[in-house]
Amino acid sequence: ADVLALLARTDPDRSKTHRGLSLFIVTKPRGGGHGFQFTQEAGAADRVGKMEGRAIDTIGYRGMHSYEVALEDWWVPAENLIGEQDGIGKGFIFQMAGFENGRLQTAARAVGVMQAAYEAALDYAQNRVVFGNPIGDYQLTQAKLGRMAVLIQAGRQFAYVVARMMANGEGATEAAMVKAYVCKAAEWVTGEAM
């Protein structure tokens, strides 16, 4: 990405806890690979800025990486403060709102994982022959595949409802609920598919 969302302490009074944090958009060069190291020309403090990032290993996230980022003397212009002057001290609130979207995204990703597991299990059930019949002909296999399909559809529809709520500025609690439900369902579906 060409930008980072950076939650930074803007009030040195640590007794303000999360109320002393602000959220900034920080531009950076596009990096190649799973780590990066950049320097920035001397900024307002007349010091060369440094930014270094390394990917954090995560299970199941392909095409999307989490990074540990270290900044030293990296200059960010005041206009990059989210919420302009009214955003000072509100960064934590803004960040939490962003996490709500992340919860919905995690639920949607889990629906995709369940769908892929179901399709693999269905293919296996149709092609694995035991005692002269595909195992998909047996009642227990049919019941498991049926339950998988129900959980997938329920998770998908729940995610759609929450997405509509969030588009209307609602659904913070429901975003947490759909993530919890769909991820738990995905555990069962993928376990049974194996």
Question: Where are the model-predicted features located?
Answer:
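Alpha-helical interface subdomain recognition
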Residues: 68-74, 78, 89-92, 97-194
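Short clusters of hydrophobic/aromatic residues that line enzyme substrate/ligand-binding pockets
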Residues: 52-56, 61, 81-82, 95, ...
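Solvent-exposed alpha-helices and their adjacent loops that cap or buttress functional pockets
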Residues: 1, 14-18, 59-63, 86-87
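A short core secondary-structure module
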Residues: 1-49
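Flexible, small-/acidic-enriched active-site or ligand-binding loops
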Residues: 32-73
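Short intrinsically disordered, low-complexity coil segments enriched in acidic
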Residues: 1-10, 54-59, 159
